[in-house]
Every structure is written in structure tokens, then in C-alpha cells.
Amino acid sequence: MLLGALEAGGTKMVMGLADGDGNILKQASCPTRLPEETLGDILAFFQGEKIDALGIATFGPVDLRADSPTFGNITNTPKLAWRNFPLYARLKDALGVPCAIDTDVNGAVLAEAELGAGEGLKNCVYFTVGTGIGGGVLSGGQLVHGLIHPEWGHVIMNRHPEDPLQRGVCPYHEHCVEGYACGPAMQARWAMPAQELPDDHRGWALEAHYLAQLCVDAMMTVSPERIVLGGGVMHHEALYPMVRQAVTSMLGGYLASPVLSDMDSYIVAPRLYPDSGLVGAALLAKQALAQ
């Protein structure tokens, strides 16, 4: 079994080949340019290989309603050239193999729950914190969709009273978590990128405040057995204990569970990073083949 995997990102595309267990055998990447140019690069990678199926874990929003005539299309993305682009249909038609598509963060949570930091769990959340913020949910062993798919980055937050930003940087919402806690928000707030902030900078406590709100919202709604925090901003490892401490404080003793007595094991880093999304795409391909 040879599985094709595509992690379609707003900045770059990562293509991979994997075996039936999700092990990545080969990978390459290309910049995300105009759709037709980028599609040519993707197909050049896969058409020389005899893949049995393709899994696509993509940036969004993406139409995931199985009965929709635009299933698999990128929808109202800020990347204007990609709006309404039929990514799934174009790749499926060109490669002629079974295909599956989901969000990049749903791909990541699938991978981490099956093979990574949430291995063996049926209820898990994965949040990525970088240029944007997104989240994938595995509930009862199934990826969560619905009206569209979860848009965790745009959950509305309470602004910290000491935040220098009066509103977040999101063009759609004044007070969503992406607007306050993504990499560009940190740049706008402190006039320097997150990776340049000193370890003792108060910006990290502010970041933990917003990410803790996000985690608590998830705990109160989808009740995950583990929360995985990934993405470029989380490279600052000291952020993890700060988020855990803030979550404990915000919970106020609510949600009595022995699991929460060990926050170090509850809110964790991804084990498969930076390949969580690519491995997830391979697992989506395996599902497509099984159907």
C-alpha cells in the first residue's frame, strides 16, 4: 500500500508518500502560489508515483458537506486567488485514485490521536498557534464537521484589561482568539515577532491568558481527554506551563476529573510535529481506500 498525502497550507504545500501505517517514506514541498501553478507542482510530485489513494489536509475554510455540489472546494479564504477553487475535484480527477479531504487541523488531530501525543484516545483536540489559529476535534473517534467545520480560531474571547491592543488583528472579528493570540497579533502588540520576545517578557503571560481561555472553552464544550498545542508560537516551551497554570485558575475547581490532576499530561506538545498534518493526510488516504 502506497498512500499519497498532501498538507495544503497557505504558505506552502507539503506532499508526501506513506506506507499503510502512516510512516512518511518521502516528502517534498513547494510554495503556495496561484492555484494553477501550485497544482502543477503537486501533480508533478504524485504523478511519478503509483499511489493507491490520496489524503488532503488543507487550509480553509473548505466545503466538507458530502452532499454539496462544491464538496472539497476552498471557500471564503483570505487568499483571494484560492476562493472557490475545487482542490479536491481537481486532484481526484488528475490522479484517478480514491481521495479524502479535511481541514489541516483535523488531519493533525487524527494523526496525534492515532500515532502521537493522544495515542489511543477517542476524544482529543489539536490547536495550532502560528500565523493563524485553528483547531481540530476528534470526538468519539470521529472527526467533527457539522454545518461547516469547527473554526476555533474565531471563538470570541474576553480581552485582557492590560492588553495594549484595543481590538484583535482579525479582519472579521474584534475579539476572537486568533485576533489576540496569533503570531501577527504578537508582532502588532509588541513590535517584534514572538520568537524575539525575551523569556521574561509579559507578552508570554498575556498569550497564555488567551490560549487558556481557548482550552477552557474546549473543555466545557467538546470535553477532550487531551489537548495538544502545536504551531510556531508554541516553540516557546515555557508557554506550556503558563497555559496549564492559567487553565487551572480559570476552571476554578470545576470539572472534577482525576485526569485534570496532572495538567502536564493533559495539555501537551504534539509528538509528530512538524509532520502532524502530513501524517494525518496519509491516514485520510487510508480511510478513502477502505471506503
Model-identified regions with their sequence ranges:
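Conserved A3 ("GATE") glycine/threonine-rich loop of ANL adenylate-forming enzymes
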Residues: 11-12, 107, 131-134
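Conserved NAD(P)H cofactor-binding loop of Rossmann-fold oxidoreductase domains
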Residues: 59
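ATP-binding/phosphotransfer module of carbohydrate and carboxylate kinases, centering on a glycine-rich
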Residues: 1-54, 62-70, 89-97, 111-121, ...
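General beta-strand structural signal in soluble alpha/beta enzymes
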Residues: 99-103
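A conserved beta-strand->loop->alpha-helix hinge within the catalytic CA
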Residues: 86
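Glycine-rich phosphate-binding loop of actin/hexokinase-like ATP-binding domains
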Residues: 119-178
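A charged helix-plus-loop insertion that forms the helical arch/lid used to bind
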Residues: 68-83
